[in-house]
Amino acid sequence: MANYFNTLTFIEKLKHLGKCRFMSNNEFSNGIQALLSKKVAIIGCGSQGLNQGLNMRDSGVNITYALRRESILNKQESWARATRNGFPVGTYDEIIPKSDVVINLTPDKCHTSVIRQIEPLMKHGSTLGYSHGFHIVEVGEKIRQDITVIMVAPKCPGTEVRQEYQRGFGVPALIAVHEENDTYDMGMTLAKSWAFALGSHRAGVLESSFVAEVKSDLMGEQTILCGMLQAGSILCFDYMISNGVNAAYAGKFIQCGWEVITEALKQGGITLMMDRLSNASKIRAFILSEKLKNILKPVFEKHMENILNGVFSKEMMLDWENNDSKLLKWREKTSQLPLEQAPNYQQEILEQTYFDYGILMVAIIKSGIELSFDTMIKSGIAPESAYYESLHELPLIANTIARKKLYEMNMVISDTAEYGNYLFCDKVVPLLKKTIIPNLRTGDLGMSPKNVNVDNIVLRNTNDMIRNHTIEKVGIQLRSYMQNMKSLSFN
């Protein structure tokens, strides 16, 4: 099999990368109708598998789990999750031949093996669903022509897919039909019903392509969504400790600070996040952000280049063949970080304190979002896709860190995201330790900032540059469709 993206012509690549259309609410007026009469099987009961199944069942879809025979016989975790939640469970041989729609929500590394087992069992004219296009685009799997291939990709980990649904809202999603596999012209109808069943129609759905989803998703998760949060957590915690801050307090400040600060992004983008700072702190955060962008721009661009040309995927798949040697080494290294070992801090930290004492964290968030967004746009990815992958999903990832630090984030994101996160951190942490950390001022993190005079012209220009960035203009439009988005309360 050959990387699908690399087989396309230059013009075809641009067409696939740029495919993006925001779908109106009335396009989902039929709800789950297209799935009501269908037997839907989900393969895999991990974070995405379980939580998508719960949402779909609550929306009225008939869901069954198809699991490996060994998983059922040995009562492994996937079997336990499905049965504990009252779902019917069966083997591939028992479930797949009867299913109209088969949704493959196993890890990327398992897809080739899974498809080899289930494709001969799938009935003529059935549908195969994915929530990430890696297997189609990067591995280059060719699916039987009579099978319709669709994708609904929620823009967050599975845990947040469920939590946002239970709040009466949902998470944005990209949906797509693989144009090589839509013989009956039914793919989009089924994808819309699936997205509706997840609750994504309440948050915003983009009609996209498998290519655009994969390339933007890989870029977002490697850089701002996971990579910058992990690198920032390591750097900020170590800096606070080196300045005499209590380890328990520093641990809670970092662990919960990302969630508190990024919650402002959901309601008002970078502008609102920066407005939570004092005028002097806003100017300082802006200056730090610009320095970070100048230093990190080549790193972001190299990651995008390796995602587009397939180098990243090739290297990661080699690690799969080596029994995840690199991934497991990085995972163990992360578990031993001083931040992960820090004792719990029992006292409350007020919401505003995270902004007042977290100027560096705000700068890290701002720079990472803008760099990720700008790099994607330059590569041909549509602004709306880039927004979801760089800004909107960030608070949902930060929520996972607030639960159990970096361990929780890395457990609920995919192995693909986790691998890319570690790859990014290995470059960025030493780079910023040499360039940014030695030049921080008292008050940039963990301590009260100094009182300084504010120049009106500088403040005006700073506000203009924040508000006129393209991501802020795109964000205003996309957030206008999220009228029922639920806010988190911290104090």
From Swiss-Prot:
Keywords: Amino-acid biosynthesis, Branched-chain amino acid biosynthesis, Magnesium, Metal-binding, NADP, Oxidoreductase, Repeat. Mg(2+) 2 binds at residues 217, 389, 393. It catalyses: (2R)-2,3-dihydroxy-3-methylbutanoate + NADP(+) = (2S)-2-acetolactate + NADPH + H(+); (2R,3R)-2,3-dihydroxy-3-methylpentanoate + NADP(+) = (S)-2-ethyl-2-hydroxy-3-oxobutanoate + NADPH + H(+). Binds 2 magnesium ions per subunit. Residues 14-208 form the KARI N-terminal Rossmann domain. Mg(2+) 1 binds at residues 217, 221. GO terms for molecular function: ketol-acid reductoisomerase activity; magnesium ion binding. NADP(+) binds at residues 45-48, 68, 78, 158. Belongs to the ketol-acid reductoisomerase family. Involved in the biosynthesis of branched-chain amino acids (BCAA). Catalyzes an alkyl-migration followed by a ketol-acid reduction of (S)-2-acetolactate (S2AL) to yield (R)-2,3-dihydroxy-isovalerate. In the isomerase reaction, S2AL is rearranged via a Mg-dependent methyl migration to produce 3-hydroxy-3-methyl-2-ketobutyrate (HMKB). In the reductase reaction, this 2-ketoacid undergoes a metal-dependent reduction by NADPH to yield (R)-2,3-dihydroxy-isovalerate. This is Ketol-acid reductoisomerase (NADP(+)). It comes from Blochmanniella pennsylvanica (strain BPEN). The lineage of its organism: Bacteria, Pseudomonadati, Pseudomonadota, Gammaproteobacteria, Enterobacterales.
